[in-house]
Curated annotation (Swiss-Prot):
Gene Ontology molecular function: any one: sulfate adenylyltransferase (ATP) activity
Family from the record: Belongs to the sulfate adenylyltransferase family.
InterPro entries in the record: ATP-Sase_PUA-like_dom, PUA-like_sf, Rossmann-like_a/b/a_fold, SO4_adenylyltransferase_pro, Sulfurylase_cat_dom, Sulphate_adenylyltransferase
E.C. numbers: 2.7.7.4
Annotated protein name in UniProt: Sulfate adenylyltransferase
Substrates-to-products reaction catalysed: sulfate + ATP + H(+) = adenosine 5'-phosphosulfate + diphosphate
Keywords: ATP-binding, Nucleotide-binding, Nucleotidyltransferase, Transferase
Keyword set includes ATP-binding: yes
Amino acid sequence: MSIVNGLVNRIDETYDVSQIEKEIKLDNIALSDLELLATGGYSPLTGFLGEEDYDSVVETLRLANGSVWSIPITLPVTEKVAESLKAGEEVKLVNNGNIYGVIQIEDIFVPDKEKEALLVYKTTDEAHPGVKKLYERPNVYVGGTIILTKRFENNQFPSYHLDPIETREAFKKRGWKTVVGFQTRNPVHRAHEYIQKSALEIVDGLFLNPLVGETKSDDIPADVRMESYEVLLQNYYPKNRVFLSVFPAAMRYAGPREAIFHALVRKNFGCTHFIVGRDHAGVGDYYGTYEAQEIFTNFTIEELGITPLFFEHSFYCTKCEAMASTKTCPHGKEDHVILSGTKVRELLRNGEIPPSTFSRKEVVEVLIKGLKKEVVTE
Protein backbone atom coordinates (compact mmCIF):
# COMPACT_ATOMS: atom_id res chain seq x y z
CA MET A 1 0.00 0.00 0.00
CA SER A 2 1.47 3.31 -1.05
CA ILE A 3 1.05 6.72 -2.63
CA VAL A 4 3.13 7.16 -5.80
CA ASN A 5 2.96 10.32 -7.94
CA GLY A 6 -0.15 11.37 -6.02
CA LEU A 7 -1.88 8.02 -6.72
CA VAL A 8 -3.20 5.99 -3.81
CA ASN A 9 -2.62 2.23 -4.05
CA ARG A 10 -4.64 0.12 -1.59
CA ILE A 11 -4.30 -3.29 -3.28
CA ASP A 12 -2.87 -6.30 -1.45
CA GLU A 13 -3.98 -9.66 -2.80
CA THR A 14 -1.81 -11.49 -0.25
CA TYR A 15 -3.65 -9.90 2.69
CA ASP A 16 -4.85 -12.60 5.09
CA VAL A 17 -8.59 -12.32 5.75
CA SER A 18 -9.02 -15.81 7.22
CA GLN A 19 -9.20 -14.58 10.82
CA ILE A 20 -11.74 -11.83 10.11
CA GLU A 21 -15.23 -12.98 11.04
CA LYS A 22 -17.50 -10.01 10.45
CA GLU A 23 -18.55 -8.88 7.00
CA ILE A 24 -20.36 -6.06 5.24
CA LYS A 25 -22.26 -6.84 2.05
CA LEU A 26 -21.52 -4.31 -0.69
CA ASP A 27 -24.08 -3.19 -3.25
CA ASN A 28 -22.89 -2.53 -6.81
CA ILE A 29 -22.19 1.15 -6.12
CA ALA A 30 -20.02 0.39 -3.07
CA LEU A 31 -18.26 -2.39 -4.99
CA SER A 32 -17.26 -0.08 -7.85
CA ASP A 33 -16.25 2.58 -5.30
CA LEU A 34 -14.07 0.02 -3.48
CA GLU A 35 -12.17 -0.68 -6.70
CA LEU A 36 -11.66 3.00 -7.52
CA LEU A 37 -10.54 3.78 -3.97
CA ALA A 38 -7.98 0.95 -4.13
CA THR A 39 -6.59 1.70 -7.60
CA GLY A 40 -6.16 5.42 -6.94
CA GLY A 41 -9.04 6.53 -9.14
CA TYR A 42 -10.43 8.41 -6.13
CA SER A 43 -7.07 9.73 -4.83
CA PRO A 44 -6.51 11.30 -2.32
CA LEU A 45 -9.23 9.16 -0.66
CA THR A 46 -7.93 5.99 1.01
CA GLY A 47 -11.31 4.65 2.08
CA PHE A 48 -14.99 5.36 2.62
CA LEU A 49 -15.55 8.75 4.24
CA GLY A 50 -15.71 9.14 8.00
CA GLU A 51 -18.10 11.63 9.56
CA GLU A 52 -15.76 14.64 9.61
CA ASP A 53 -14.82 14.30 5.93
CA TYR A 54 -18.40 13.42 4.98
CA ASP A 55 -19.81 16.57 6.64
CA SER A 56 -17.08 18.68 5.07
CA VAL A 57 -17.67 17.30 1.55
CA VAL A 58 -21.45 17.71 1.79
CA GLU A 59 -21.21 21.27 3.12
CA THR A 60 -18.07 22.69 1.48
CA LEU A 61 -17.06 20.41 -1.46
CA ARG A 62 -13.78 19.82 0.35
CA LEU A 63 -12.33 17.17 2.63
CA ALA A 64 -11.65 18.19 6.22
CA ASN A 65 -8.02 18.95 5.25
CA GLY A 66 -9.16 21.42 2.57
CA SER A 67 -8.56 19.24 -0.52
CA VAL A 68 -11.26 19.63 -3.18
CA TRP A 69 -13.70 16.68 -3.22
CA SER A 70 -17.32 17.11 -4.23
CA ILE A 71 -19.16 13.76 -3.97
CA PRO A 72 -19.47 11.82 -0.68
CA ILE A 73 -18.07 8.29 -1.19
CA THR A 74 -19.88 6.34 1.51
CA LEU A 75 -20.43 2.79 2.71
CA PRO A 76 -24.06 2.40 3.86
CA VAL A 77 -25.11 -0.46 6.16
CA THR A 78 -28.40 -1.30 7.89
CA GLU A 79 -29.02 -0.40 11.54
CA LYS A 80 -28.85 -4.11 12.37
CA VAL A 81 -25.41 -4.54 10.78
CA ALA A 82 -24.19 -1.28 12.36
CA GLU A 83 -25.09 -2.56 15.85
CA SER A 84 -22.70 -5.48 15.39
CA LEU A 85 -19.76 -3.26 14.36
CA LYS A 86 -17.40 -1.03 16.30
CA ALA A 87 -14.63 1.41 15.50
CA GLY A 88 -11.15 -0.13 15.49
CA GLU A 89 -12.09 -3.50 14.03
CA GLU A 90 -11.41 -4.98 10.61
CA VAL A 91 -14.39 -6.22 8.62
CA LYS A 92 -14.54 -8.13 5.33
CA LEU A 93 -16.18 -6.48 2.32
CA VAL A 94 -18.26 -8.99 0.42
CA ASN A 95 -20.33 -9.04 -2.76
CA ASN A 96 -22.12 -12.06 -4.15
CA GLY A 97 -20.32 -14.43 -1.78
CA ASN A 98 -16.85 -13.18 -2.80
CA ILE A 99 -14.53 -11.37 -0.38
CA TYR A 100 -13.12 -8.35 -2.23
CA GLY A 101 -11.50 -6.42 0.56
CA VAL A 102 -11.46 -5.26 4.16
CA ILE A 103 -12.27 -2.00 5.88
CA GLN A 104 -10.48 -0.81 8.99
CA ILE A 105 -13.41 0.87 10.70
CA GLU A 106 -12.74 4.37 12.02
CA ASP A 107 -16.26 5.69 12.20
CA ILE A 108 -19.92 4.61 12.31
CA PHE A 109 -22.47 7.40 11.98
CA VAL A 110 -26.00 8.26 10.92
CA PRO A 111 -26.05 10.86 8.13
CA ASP A 112 -28.71 13.48 7.53
CA LYS A 113 -29.85 12.14 4.16
CA GLU A 114 -32.21 15.00 3.47
CA LYS A 115 -29.35 17.44 3.88
CA GLU A 116 -27.13 15.26 1.66
CA ALA A 117 -29.83 15.19 -1.03
CA LEU A 118 -30.41 18.93 -0.87
CA LEU A 119 -26.74 19.95 -0.94
CA VAL A 120 -25.32 17.27 -3.26
CA TYR A 121 -28.24 16.87 -5.69
CA LYS A 122 -29.91 20.26 -5.07
CA THR A 123 -33.27 18.53 -4.56
CA THR A 124 -35.05 16.09 -2.25
CA ASP A 125 -37.33 14.97 -5.08
CA GLU A 126 -37.31 11.17 -5.20
CA ALA A 127 -38.01 11.26 -8.94
CA HIS A 128 -34.34 12.28 -9.24
CA PRO A 129 -32.41 8.99 -9.81
CA GLY A 130 -29.53 10.01 -7.53
CA VAL A 131 -31.83 11.01 -4.68
CA LYS A 132 -33.93 7.88 -5.17
CA LYS A 133 -30.80 5.72 -4.86
CA LEU A 134 -29.60 7.70 -1.82
CA TYR A 135 -32.88 7.03 0.03
CA GLU A 136 -33.01 3.38 -1.06
CA ARG A 137 -29.58 2.58 0.37
CA PRO A 138 -29.24 1.75 4.11
CA ASN A 139 -29.23 4.53 6.71
CA VAL A 140 -25.94 4.15 8.61
CA TYR A 141 -22.52 4.97 7.13
CA VAL A 142 -19.28 3.17 7.97
CA GLY A 143 -16.05 5.11 7.42
CA GLY A 144 -12.49 3.81 7.29
CA THR A 145 -9.51 2.92 5.12
CA ILE A 146 -9.85 -0.04 2.79
CA ILE A 147 -7.67 -2.75 1.28
CA LEU A 148 -8.65 -4.49 -1.95
CA THR A 149 -7.73 -8.16 -1.47
CA LYS A 150 -9.20 -9.58 -4.67
CA ARG A 151 -9.36 -8.07 -8.15
CA PHE A 152 -12.71 -8.26 -9.89
CA GLU A 153 -13.28 -11.02 -12.37
CA ASN A 154 -15.94 -10.89 -15.07
CA ASN A 155 -15.22 -7.28 -15.92
CA GLN A 156 -17.50 -6.61 -18.85
CA PHE A 157 -14.71 -5.01 -20.89
CA PRO A 158 -11.40 -6.54 -19.72
CA SER A 159 -9.26 -5.00 -22.47
CA TYR A 160 -10.65 -1.53 -21.69
CA HIS A 161 -10.72 -1.87 -17.88
CA LEU A 162 -7.50 -0.08 -16.92
CA ASP A 163 -6.28 1.31 -13.61
CA PRO A 164 -5.06 4.93 -13.40
CA ILE A 165 -1.45 3.74 -13.28
CA GLU A 166 -2.02 1.91 -16.60
CA THR A 167 -3.69 4.81 -18.41
CA ARG A 168 -0.92 7.16 -17.25
CA GLU A 169 1.64 4.71 -18.64
CA ALA A 170 -0.27 4.44 -21.94
CA PHE A 171 -0.30 8.25 -22.35
CA LYS A 172 3.42 8.40 -21.54
CA LYS A 173 4.20 5.68 -24.11
CA ARG A 174 2.39 7.71 -26.76
CA GLY A 175 4.45 10.76 -25.84
CA TRP A 176 1.36 12.74 -24.82
CA LYS A 177 2.18 15.66 -22.53
CA THR A 178 -1.37 17.04 -22.59
CA VAL A 179 -4.46 14.82 -22.51
CA VAL A 180 -8.11 15.88 -22.49
CA GLY A 181 -10.64 13.62 -20.76
CA PHE A 182 -14.21 13.18 -21.97
CA GLN A 183 -16.87 11.65 -19.73
CA THR A 184 -19.95 10.11 -21.28
CA ARG A 185 -22.82 7.77 -20.46
CA ASN A 186 -24.38 8.15 -23.94
CA PRO A 187 -23.34 7.08 -27.42
CA VAL A 188 -21.19 9.81 -29.00
CA HIS A 189 -23.29 11.95 -31.36
CA ARG A 190 -22.06 14.61 -33.79
CA ALA A 191 -22.15 17.41 -31.21
CA HIS A 192 -19.86 15.38 -28.91
CA GLU A 193 -17.58 14.61 -31.84
CA TYR A 194 -17.34 18.29 -32.72
CA ILE A 195 -16.44 19.20 -29.12
CA GLN A 196 -13.89 16.38 -28.77
CA LYS A 197 -12.18 17.27 -32.02
CA SER A 198 -12.14 20.97 -31.14
CA ALA A 199 -10.35 20.04 -27.89
CA LEU A 200 -7.99 17.72 -29.78
CA GLU A 201 -6.77 20.73 -31.75
CA ILE A 202 -5.10 22.08 -28.60
CA VAL A 203 -3.88 18.92 -26.81
CA ASP A 204 -1.84 15.82 -27.69
CA GLY A 205 -4.46 13.18 -26.99
CA LEU A 206 -8.13 12.52 -26.25
CA PHE A 207 -9.06 10.11 -23.43
CA LEU A 208 -12.57 8.81 -24.10
CA ASN A 209 -13.61 7.43 -20.72
CA PRO A 210 -17.22 6.22 -20.77
CA LEU A 211 -18.88 5.43 -17.47
CA VAL A 212 -19.96 1.78 -17.30
CA GLY A 213 -21.06 1.47 -13.67
CA GLU A 214 -24.67 1.60 -12.54
CA THR A 215 -26.89 4.01 -14.54
CA LYS A 216 -30.63 4.62 -14.73
CA SER A 217 -32.76 2.04 -16.52
CA ASP A 218 -33.47 4.04 -19.70
CA ASP A 219 -29.80 4.79 -20.42
CA ILE A 220 -28.41 2.80 -23.37
CA PRO A 221 -26.67 -0.38 -22.08
CA ALA A 222 -22.88 -0.20 -21.66
CA ASP A 223 -22.07 -3.02 -24.11
CA VAL A 224 -24.01 -1.28 -26.91
CA ARG A 225 -22.35 2.03 -26.10
CA MET A 226 -18.87 0.48 -26.11
CA GLU A 227 -19.44 -0.99 -29.56
CA SER A 228 -20.64 2.42 -30.77
CA TYR A 229 -17.44 4.07 -29.44
CA GLU A 230 -15.28 1.45 -31.16
CA VAL A 231 -16.83 1.94 -34.61
CA LEU A 232 -16.71 5.72 -34.24
CA LEU A 233 -13.03 5.82 -33.25
CA GLN A 234 -12.15 3.29 -35.93
CA ASN A 235 -13.74 5.31 -38.73
CA TYR A 236 -13.56 8.97 -37.78
CA TYR A 237 -10.65 9.63 -35.37
CA PRO A 238 -6.86 9.48 -35.84
CA LYS A 239 -5.86 6.24 -34.07
CA ASN A 240 -2.68 7.70 -32.57
CA ARG A 241 -4.54 10.59 -30.94
CA VAL A 242 -7.31 8.80 -28.99
CA PHE A 243 -7.42 6.29 -26.15
CA LEU A 244 -10.53 4.42 -24.99
CA SER A 245 -10.89 3.01 -21.48
CA VAL A 246 -13.89 2.51 -19.18
CA PHE A 247 -14.74 4.33 -15.95
CA PRO A 248 -16.33 1.67 -13.69
CA ALA A 249 -18.08 4.09 -11.31
CA ALA A 250 -21.82 4.43 -10.81
CA MET A 251 -23.54 7.48 -12.24
CA ARG A 252 -24.71 9.87 -9.51
CA TYR A 253 -26.61 12.39 -11.71
CA ALA A 254 -25.36 15.13 -9.37
CA GLY A 255 -24.83 17.72 -12.11
CA PRO A 256 -22.39 20.47 -11.08
CA ARG A 257 -20.88 18.52 -8.18
CA GLU A 258 -20.40 15.47 -10.35
CA ALA A 259 -18.64 17.60 -12.97
CA ILE A 260 -15.99 18.51 -10.36
CA PHE A 261 -15.79 14.86 -9.27
CA HIS A 262 -15.40 13.66 -12.87
CA ALA A 263 -12.60 16.17 -13.45
CA LEU A 264 -10.71 15.14 -10.28
CA VAL A 265 -10.96 11.46 -11.19
CA ARG A 266 -9.70 12.08 -14.76
CA LYS A 267 -6.72 13.94 -13.29
CA ASN A 268 -5.91 10.71 -11.43
CA PHE A 269 -6.16 8.78 -14.70
CA GLY A 270 -3.53 11.11 -16.18
CA CYS A 271 -5.50 13.90 -17.87
CA THR A 272 -4.30 17.51 -17.90
CA HIS A 273 -7.62 18.84 -19.27
CA PHE A 274 -11.27 17.87 -18.94
CA ILE A 275 -14.23 18.71 -21.17
CA VAL A 276 -17.30 20.14 -19.44
CA GLY A 277 -20.23 20.61 -21.77
CA ARG A 278 -23.88 21.55 -21.43
CA ASP A 279 -25.65 20.15 -18.33
CA HIS A 280 -22.77 17.83 -17.45
CA ALA A 281 -23.97 14.80 -15.41
CA GLY A 282 -27.43 16.34 -15.30
CA VAL A 283 -30.82 14.70 -15.47
CA GLY A 284 -34.24 16.19 -16.22
CA ASP A 285 -34.45 19.91 -15.42
CA TYR A 286 -32.79 19.82 -12.00
CA TYR A 287 -29.76 21.91 -13.01
CA GLY A 288 -29.16 25.02 -15.09
CA THR A 289 -27.75 24.52 -18.59
CA TYR A 290 -24.27 25.79 -17.70
CA GLU A 291 -24.33 25.35 -13.92
CA ALA A 292 -21.79 22.50 -14.17
CA GLN A 293 -19.35 24.96 -15.76
CA GLU A 294 -20.06 27.82 -13.36
CA ILE A 295 -19.23 25.70 -10.28
CA PHE A 296 -15.58 25.58 -11.40
CA THR A 297 -15.22 29.31 -10.62
CA ASN A 298 -15.18 28.33 -6.92
CA PHE A 299 -11.80 26.62 -7.34
CA THR A 300 -8.40 27.47 -8.76
CA ILE A 301 -6.84 25.32 -11.48
CA GLU A 302 -3.90 24.75 -9.10
CA GLU A 303 -6.08 23.18 -6.40
CA LEU A 304 -8.06 21.13 -8.93
CA GLY A 305 -4.87 19.93 -10.62
CA ILE A 306 -6.64 19.82 -13.99
CA THR A 307 -7.81 22.45 -16.48
CA PRO A 308 -11.52 22.41 -17.37
CA LEU A 309 -12.42 23.17 -21.00
CA PHE A 310 -15.89 24.67 -21.31
CA PHE A 311 -17.95 24.21 -24.45
CA GLU A 312 -21.22 25.80 -25.47
CA HIS A 313 -23.96 23.54 -26.70
CA SER A 314 -23.16 22.50 -30.27
CA PHE A 315 -25.62 21.97 -33.10
CA TYR A 316 -25.76 21.31 -36.81
CA CYS A 317 -26.43 24.52 -38.73
CA THR A 318 -28.30 23.98 -42.00
CA LYS A 319 -27.01 27.32 -43.36
CA CYS A 320 -23.35 26.73 -42.39
CA GLU A 321 -23.80 23.10 -43.43
CA ALA A 322 -21.55 22.17 -40.52
CA MET A 323 -21.40 21.58 -36.79
CA ALA A 324 -21.15 24.85 -34.88
CA SER A 325 -21.95 26.64 -31.63
CA THR A 326 -23.24 30.13 -30.90
CA LYS A 327 -19.58 31.18 -30.66
CA THR A 328 -18.94 30.27 -34.30
CA CYS A 329 -22.31 30.52 -36.06
CA PRO A 330 -24.24 33.75 -36.80
CA HIS A 331 -27.53 32.10 -37.81
CA GLY A 332 -30.77 31.89 -35.87
CA LYS A 333 -32.32 29.00 -33.98
CA GLU A 334 -34.53 28.12 -36.94
CA ASP A 335 -31.37 26.98 -38.79
CA HIS A 336 -30.04 24.89 -35.92
CA VAL A 337 -30.59 21.15 -35.50
CA ILE A 338 -30.14 20.55 -31.77
CA LEU A 339 -28.50 17.22 -30.95
CA SER A 340 -28.61 15.33 -27.67
CA GLY A 341 -28.22 11.78 -26.40
CA THR A 342 -31.82 11.93 -25.19
CA LYS A 343 -33.03 12.92 -28.66
CA VAL A 344 -31.07 10.10 -30.31
CA ARG A 345 -32.53 7.59 -27.82
CA GLU A 346 -36.02 8.97 -28.45
CA LEU A 347 -35.75 8.63 -32.25
CA LEU A 348 -34.42 5.09 -32.00
CA ARG A 349 -37.11 3.98 -29.56
CA ASN A 350 -39.76 5.39 -31.90
CA GLY A 351 -38.32 3.32 -34.72
CA GLU A 352 -36.89 6.38 -36.50
CA ILE A 353 -33.35 6.48 -37.87
CA PRO A 354 -31.39 9.55 -36.69
CA PRO A 355 -30.17 11.60 -39.68
CA SER A 356 -26.44 11.78 -40.47
CA THR A 357 -26.45 15.31 -39.03
CA PHE A 358 -27.21 13.67 -35.65
CA SER A 359 -25.13 10.54 -35.65
CA ARG A 360 -22.62 8.69 -37.84
CA LYS A 361 -24.30 5.87 -39.78
CA GLU A 362 -21.97 3.22 -38.29
CA VAL A 363 -22.99 4.33 -34.78
CA VAL A 364 -26.69 4.29 -35.70
CA GLU A 365 -26.36 0.72 -37.02
CA VAL A 366 -24.83 -0.42 -33.72
CA LEU A 367 -27.55 1.33 -31.70
CA ILE A 368 -30.39 -0.14 -33.79
CA LYS A 369 -28.90 -3.63 -33.43
CA GLY A 370 -28.54 -3.08 -29.66
CA LEU A 371 -32.09 -1.83 -29.35
CA LYS A 372 -33.47 -4.86 -31.19
CA LYS A 373 -31.54 -7.11 -28.82
CA GLU A 374 -32.98 -5.17 -25.86
CA VAL A 375 -36.54 -5.62 -27.14
CA VAL A 376 -36.00 -9.37 -27.61
CA THR A 377 -34.67 -9.85 -24.06
CA GLU A 378 -37.34 -7.72 -22.36
